[in-house]
């Protein structure tokens, strides 16, 4: 917005204030973000109108803009929370804690725990730091003093706290001056003109005209009472301009049955919703010649009104009665020099020689180190980046020339050199598509390793195929293409049948971006004349016609979560633009700064982590924070990059592939990426090829994957410490199973017992790794904690030192409701929150929510029948719980609204296992009916089901439990049944490996993955504990009962009922026994591991591999 337009807003604000449109004044202040009315803010705080306070603030800043903003929102929400506690309105306080204060836990988890702890106090003033808290009125006044300091110090409020000095009724004066000037231009000026409208210019009419003007020098709209107006607080300073909305709304565009023409306006609005699949980056290429079109540069009128400076000035101290809040990286007394965040991939980890110049790259959506490359001579390559191995290299070849059109055959004869314009994987990685510069699209099916098979060849367009993307209209996987023939076409990905053709562009179509919002699916397309169009799958024409910044080569992409839309374009003059679109308002929200004045090629961009943008420009990779228009940092990758390098992130943002000179590809990595590559490299050095019937290798970076455990829990692992051991490859040595038969051959510890219980039904290590929680068959919970001391500096669980059985000073126990059920018949289940503060549990009665610090019961819900038998949190929303029931149903329950959202029916007996995959967006369930079901978490529809394969000759008890737990790759899962261990692939629900229990052997009681998914710890009815290699389900170590049970119990039928793996130490596990005891196990320090992996079958190792810091088996709240 220009400075004059900004000043006009101030004039309107003054006019509204004078006319006493009070609510409208403050609404315009908020929406424009030009003037922060401190007096109005103070009044709303004093009155406790917290919703209005936050709504008003939202026009100027957001919670995560900077530390000042974060503290402002924190103090407001904390005050609202304390007032609810002071009124003894516990439900409201809990609601504020979950909805408003939870966001701060990621910055200061200890503080959030302390705030949560206030719920357990009768009077929160018992907290030492809040002991001076007075009444509500005085507390608000004290807080307001601190808020004013924070606002005045916040750079986002700079130049917004003073209203410009204006004469009274300045807008009226300007209009009257204009009317006087108009009257002077009248050809027949009348002495007493009558001004009846401002909608058209004034002109005195002849005497025979019907209109009778009034004196022009009368005040506008007559003499009206004047308000006091805004105080003259001094001149305003400079302000960053904002994007101006375009008068071409797209409201209702989806309801129009035919093409609706719109005027082409620079930076026009794109009012569309959020997608399901992130649009991929586009490659630069040489498009056909088009006439040049002028377009505003990045420093013109497309800049956000909210700039976020990197430098932060002095901190403001907090009041004595405030809980102090500090955040990472906080500096005192000095401005900070910004440093590139550690989660950006900045280290050159791999350099790959492709052989020809890369034009397009795409990482596999699940196998995070698998990179697909297309080059300028039509080659495609498939790289395992971790091992630096090129798995596949294919040159361009038409599969069936006889089926090609004559124009294509003629084009290939005239110019046989064909370039790859785009490569892209399907959402599940089972297919990939290649778009070529000559007519052709080829689809390959991928089956792991080097197994790449021809699937479909489509003669798609006349001329080049410029882009290709996958979409799922009507839940049918399709391939969408665009080309030089100015069309967009949609093809059935299974058969190659053309479903739709979209025509309407007047220039070659450069890129496409499929997208869906709710149940409406559509496609964005951009052409080389700068036009952006949107299409529904209905052959009814374009719904949108706007112009993109740069008016030439433009691509569009969404953030990974589909909530934010970006476009990147380069003009024919080399000016490049990245902008974010405000879909709800239909305007350019912000234009990012930092491009070279004249880019030396078409700039390519990508997004990652719902936070960063990256683009290849000026022989470097440039990064932006999505919320800040200024350049975050630029990296040259040790030099040697192309002028406008092609770039591509892997799905989790831990790796970034960048094209370089001399046909090279550089792969950048952050710390997670380096660990991922290191693990893959170590594993590949042990075996070069996967075993027969092995599971394809799938890696996931450490920071995002949560592994659902056998106890219905899924833990987000960030500090797992895998032990990458050097297994012997000496073929001359004979492998021997490791047997542990004496207490001296391992480290084991029976945890001390303050009370006797009959048997342990469920067992969990806490997420922090310093405690164990057990649920006994009598519905009582037991908690052991290790203390930090000289002998245990970390305070983590260890078999070398006994923990303390912990209980609060009140002496109360966490005891589940048992209703009228027989404890022996009840099925206990529980789930632990990721911050270890709460446990949700049931033992045949109501489900209870306990505070782990005080052992108090916070809530109970869902009384039987039916009774809960398994609990699992949804990986994207901690308020959604999947609850398995004893009536064979699965209830999808929303804790916040206390409502069952869906009821899933597919089993015939009680539910015994649930596990979520946040990669495949599915829920896998298992039941006492030995059946496995896969449910889609989007609509909770059953996708597949299969009855467990019971080994031949084995009988099974009528209510035998079947447990499921996802491997760290989130694609394969472990099935545990008394007759077997099995590994299944989820998408096909196919058994990949099975280890059956011999007919004469003791049945399995429980099993779980180690935290890195490399091992499977398994307990048996005869008290034996076995350790298997998860890659091939081969036994590597056996712990006999004599190693941990005293001789007096050797013939007493005492055995493990449940087993749990430590969340960070991959060689530590614990078992819960049928006599109520809990044992923890570790290998001897001299050994460091449980046995040696058996030699690979048929001379090769299986390829289910682990990543360095992912996994778990026993906690329940994954990160959202």
From Swiss-Prot:
<feature type="repeat" description="WD 1">
    <location>
        <begin position="353"/>
        <end position="393"/>
    </location>
</feature>
<feature type="repeat" description="WD 13">
    <location>
        <begin position="999"/>
        <end position="1038"/>
    </location>
</feature>
<dbReference type="GO" id="GO:0010072">
    <property type="term" value="P:primary shoot apical meristem specification"/>
</dbReference>
<feature type="repeat" description="WD 7">
    <location>
        <begin position="639"/>
        <end position="678"/>
    </location>
</feature>
<keyword id="KW-0539">Nucleus</keyword>
<feature type="domain" description="LisH">
    <location>
        <begin position="4"/>
        <end position="36"/>
    </location>
</feature>
<feature type="modified residue" description="Phosphoserine">
    <location>
        <position position="214"/>
    </location>
</feature>
<feature type="repeat" description="WD 11">
    <location>
        <begin position="863"/>
        <end position="903"/>
    </location>
</feature>
<keyword id="KW-0853">WD repeat</keyword>
<keyword id="KW-0805">Transcription regulation</keyword>
<feature type="compositionally biased region" description="Polar residues">
    <location>
        <begin position="1099"/>
        <end position="1120"/>
    </location>
</feature>
<dbReference type="InterPro" id="IPR054532">
    <property type="entry name" value="TPL_SMU1_LisH-like"/>
</dbReference>
<dbReference type="Pfam" id="PF21359">
    <property type="entry name" value="zf_topless"/>
</dbReference>
<keyword id="KW-0677">Repeat</keyword>
<feature type="repeat" description="WD 3">
    <location>
        <begin position="460"/>
        <end position="501"/>
    </location>
</feature>
<dbReference type="GO" id="GO:0005634">
    <property type="term" value="C:nucleus"/>
</dbReference>
<dbReference type="InterPro" id="IPR048419">
    <property type="entry name" value="Topless_Znf"/>
</dbReference>
<dbReference type="InterPro" id="IPR015943">
    <property type="entry name" value="WD40/YVTN_repeat-like_dom_sf"/>
</dbReference>
<comment type="function">
    <text>Transcriptional corepressor. Activates TIR-NB-LRR R protein-mediated immune responses through repression of negative regulators such as CNGC2/DND1. Negative regulator of jasmonate responses.</text>
</comment>
<dbReference type="GO" id="GO:0006355">
    <property type="term" value="P:regulation of DNA-templated transcription"/>
</dbReference>
<feature type="region of interest" description="Disordered">
    <location>
        <begin position="283"/>
        <end position="307"/>
    </location>
</feature>
<dbReference type="InterPro" id="IPR054080">
    <property type="entry name" value="TPR1-like_2nd"/>
</dbReference>
<dbReference type="Pfam" id="PF17814">
    <property type="entry name" value="LisH_TPL"/>
</dbReference>
<feature type="domain" description="CTLH">
    <location>
        <begin position="34"/>
        <end position="92"/>
    </location>
</feature>
<feature type="repeat" description="WD 9">
    <location>
        <begin position="755"/>
        <end position="794"/>
    </location>
</feature>
<dbReference type="InterPro" id="IPR019775">
    <property type="entry name" value="WD40_repeat_CS"/>
</dbReference>
<feature type="repeat" description="WD 6">
    <location>
        <begin position="595"/>
        <end position="634"/>
    </location>
</feature>
<dbReference type="InterPro" id="IPR027728">
    <property type="entry name" value="Topless_fam"/>
</dbReference>
<feature type="repeat" description="WD 5">
    <location>
        <begin position="548"/>
        <end position="591"/>
    </location>
</feature>
<comment type="subunit">
    <text>Tetramer. Interacts with SNC1 (via TIR domain) and HDA19. Interacts with SPL (via EAR motif). Interacts with SPEAR3/TIE1. Binds to and corepresses GAF1/IDD2.</text>
</comment>
<keyword id="KW-0804">Transcription</keyword>
<feature type="repeat" description="WD 10">
    <location>
        <begin position="822"/>
        <end position="860"/>
    </location>
</feature>
<feature type="repeat" description="WD 8">
    <location>
        <begin position="699"/>
        <end position="745"/>
    </location>
</feature>
<dbReference type="InterPro" id="IPR036322">
    <property type="entry name" value="WD40_repeat_dom_sf"/>
</dbReference>
<dbReference type="Pfam" id="PF21889">
    <property type="entry name" value="TPR1-like_2nd"/>
</dbReference>
<protein>
    <recommendedName>
        <fullName>Topless-related protein 1</fullName>
    </recommendedName>
</protein>
<feature type="region of interest" description="Disordered">
    <location>
        <begin position="210"/>
        <end position="235"/>
    </location>
</feature>
<feature type="region of interest" description="Disordered">
    <location>
        <begin position="1087"/>
        <end position="1120"/>
    </location>
</feature>
<feature type="repeat" description="WD 12">
    <location>
        <begin position="906"/>
        <end position="945"/>
    </location>
</feature>
<feature type="repeat" description="WD 4">
    <location>
        <begin position="504"/>
        <end position="545"/>
    </location>
</feature>
<keyword id="KW-0597">Phosphoprotein</keyword>
<dbReference type="InterPro" id="IPR006594">
    <property type="entry name" value="LisH"/>
</dbReference>
């Amino acid at each position: 917005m220009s400075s004059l337009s900004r000043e006009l807003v101030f004039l309107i604000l003054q006019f509204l204030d004078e006319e006493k449109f009070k609510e409208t004044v403050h609404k315009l202040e908020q929406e424009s973000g030009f003037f922060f009315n401190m007096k109005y803010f103070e009044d709303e705080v004093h009155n406790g109108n917290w919703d209005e306070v936050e709504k008003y603030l939202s026009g100027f800043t957001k919670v995560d803009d900077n530390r000042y903003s974060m503290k402002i929102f924190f103090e407001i929400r904390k005050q609202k929370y304390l007032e609810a506690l002071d009124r003894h309105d516990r439900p409201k306080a809990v609601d504020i804690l979950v909805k408003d204060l939870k966001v701060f836990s990621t910055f200061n988890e200890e503080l959030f725990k302390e705030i949560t702890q206030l719920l357990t106090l009768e009077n929160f003033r018992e907290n030492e730091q809040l002991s001076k808290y007075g009444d509500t009125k005085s507390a608000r006044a004290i807080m307001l003093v601190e808020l004013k300091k924070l606002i005045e110090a916040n750079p986002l409020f700079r130049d917004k706290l003073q209203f410009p000095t204006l004469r009274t009724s300045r807008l009226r004066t300007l209009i009257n001056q204009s009317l006087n000037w108009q009257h002077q231009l009248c050809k027949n000026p009348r002495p007493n003109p009558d001004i009846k409208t401002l909608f058209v210019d004034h002109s005195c009419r002849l005497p025979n005209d019907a209109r009778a003007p009034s004196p022009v020098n009368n005040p506008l709209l007559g003499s009206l009472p004047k308000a006091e107006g805004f105080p003259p607080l001094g001149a305003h300073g400079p302000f960053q301009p904002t994007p101006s909305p375009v008068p071409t709304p797209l409201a209702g565009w989806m309801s129009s049955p035919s093409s609706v023409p719109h005027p082409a306006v620079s930076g026009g609005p794109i009012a569309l919703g959020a997608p399901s699949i992130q649009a991929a980056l586009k490659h630069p290429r040489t498009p056909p010649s088009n006439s040049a079109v002028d377009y505003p540069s990045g420093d013109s009128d497309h800049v956000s009104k909210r700039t976020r400076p990197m430098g932060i000035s002095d901190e403001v101290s907090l009041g004595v009665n405030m809980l102090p809040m500090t955040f990472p990286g906080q500096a005192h007394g000095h401005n900070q020099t910004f440093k590139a965040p550690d989660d950006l991939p900045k280290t050159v980890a791999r350099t790959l020689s492709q052989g020809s110049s890369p034009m397009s790259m795409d990482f596999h959506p699940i196998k995070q180190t698998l990179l697909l490359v297309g080059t300028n001579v039509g080659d495609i390559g498939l790289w395992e980046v971790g091992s630096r191995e090129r798995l596949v290299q294919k040159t361009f070849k038409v599969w069936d020339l006889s089926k090609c059109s004559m124009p294509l055959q003629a084009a290939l004869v005239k110019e046989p050199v064909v370039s790859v314009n785009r490569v892209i994987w399907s959402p599940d990685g089972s297919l990939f598509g290649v778009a070529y510069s000559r007519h052709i699209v080829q689809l390959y099916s991928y089956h792991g390793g080097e197994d790449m098979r021809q699937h479909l060849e489509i003669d798609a367009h006349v001329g080049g195929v410029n882009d290709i993307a996958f979409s799922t209209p009507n839940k049918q996987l399709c391939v969408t293409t665009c080309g030089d023939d100015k069309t967009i076409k949609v093809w059935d990905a299974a058969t190659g049948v053309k479903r739709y053709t979209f025509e309407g562009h007047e220039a070659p179509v450069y890129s496409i971006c499929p997208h869906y919002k709710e149940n409406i699916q559509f496609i964005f397309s951009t052409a080389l004349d700068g036009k952006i169009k949107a299409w529904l799958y209905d052959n009814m024409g374009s719904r949108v016609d706007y112009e993109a910044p740069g008016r030439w080569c433009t691509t569009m992409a969404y953030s990974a979560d589909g909530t934010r839309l970006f476009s990147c374009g380069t003009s024919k003059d080399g000016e490049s633009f990245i902008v974010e679109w405000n879909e709800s308002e239909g305007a350019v929200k912000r234009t990012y700064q930092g491009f070279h004045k004249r880019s030396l090629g078409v700039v390519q961009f990508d997004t990652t982590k719902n936070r960063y943008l990256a683009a290849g420009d000026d022989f470097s990779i440039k990064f932006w924070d999505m919320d800040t228009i200024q350049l975050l940092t630029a990296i040259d990758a040790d030099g040697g990059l192309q002028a406008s390098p092609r770039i591509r992130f892997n799905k989790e943002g831990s790796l970034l592939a960048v094209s370089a000179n001399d046909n090279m590809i550089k792969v950048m990595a952050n710390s997670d990426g380096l660990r991922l590559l290191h693990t893959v490299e170590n594993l590949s050095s042990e075996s070069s090829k996967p075993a027969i019937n092995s599971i394809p290798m799938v890696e996931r970076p450490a920071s995002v994957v949560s592994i659902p455990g056998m106890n219905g829990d899924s833990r987000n692992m960030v500090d797992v410490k895998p032990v990458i051991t050097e297994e012997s490859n000496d073929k001359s040595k004979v492998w021997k199973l490791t047997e542990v038969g004496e207490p001296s051959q391992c480290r084991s510890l029976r945890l001390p017992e303050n009370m006797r219980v009959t048997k342990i039904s469920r067992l969990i290590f806490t997420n922090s790794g310093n405690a164990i929680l057990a649920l006994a068959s009598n519905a009582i919970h037991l908690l052991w904690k290790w203390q930090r001391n000289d002998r245990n500096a970390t305070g983590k669980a260890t078999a070398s030192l006994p923990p303390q059985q912990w209980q609060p000073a009140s002496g109360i126990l966490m005891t589940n409701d048992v209703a009228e059920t027989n404890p022996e018949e009840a099925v206990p289940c529980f789930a632990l929150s990721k911050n270890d503060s709460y446990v949700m549990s049931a033992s045949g009665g109501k489900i209870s929510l306990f505070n782990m610090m005080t052992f108090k019961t916070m809530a109970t819900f869902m009384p039987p029948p039916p009774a809960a038998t398994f609990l699992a949190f949804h990986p994207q929303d901690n308020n959604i719980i999947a609850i398995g029931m004893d009536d064979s149903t699965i209830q999808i329950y929303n804790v916040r609204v206390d409502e069952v959202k869906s009821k899933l029916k597919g089993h015939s007996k009680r539910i015994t296992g649930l596990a979520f995959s946040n990669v495949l967006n599915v829920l896998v369930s298992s039941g006492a009916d030995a059946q496995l079901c896969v449910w889609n978490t989007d609509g909770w529809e059953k996708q597949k089901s299969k009855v467990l394969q019971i080994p031949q000759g084995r009988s099974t008890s009528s209510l035998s439990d079947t447990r499921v737990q996802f491997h760290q790759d989130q694609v394969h899962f472990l099935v545990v049944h008394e007759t077997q261990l099995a590994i299944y692939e989820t998408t096909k629900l196919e058994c990949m490996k099975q280890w059956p229990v011999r007919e004469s052997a003791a049945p399995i009681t429980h099993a779980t993955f180690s935290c890195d998914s490399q091992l499977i710890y398994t307990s048996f009815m005869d008290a034996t504990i076995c350790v298997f290699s998860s890659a091939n389900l081969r036994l590597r170590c056996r712990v006999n009962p004599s190693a941990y049970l005293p001789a007096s119990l050797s013939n007493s039928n005492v055995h493990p009922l449940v087993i749990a793996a430590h969340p960070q130490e991959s060689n530590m596990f614990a078992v819960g026994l049928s006599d109520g005891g809990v044992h923890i196990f570790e290998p001897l320090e001299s050994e460091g591991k449980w046995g040696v992996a058996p030699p690979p079958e048929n001379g090769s190792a299986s390829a289910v591999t682990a990543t360095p810091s992912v996994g778990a088996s026993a906690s329940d709240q994954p990160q959202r």
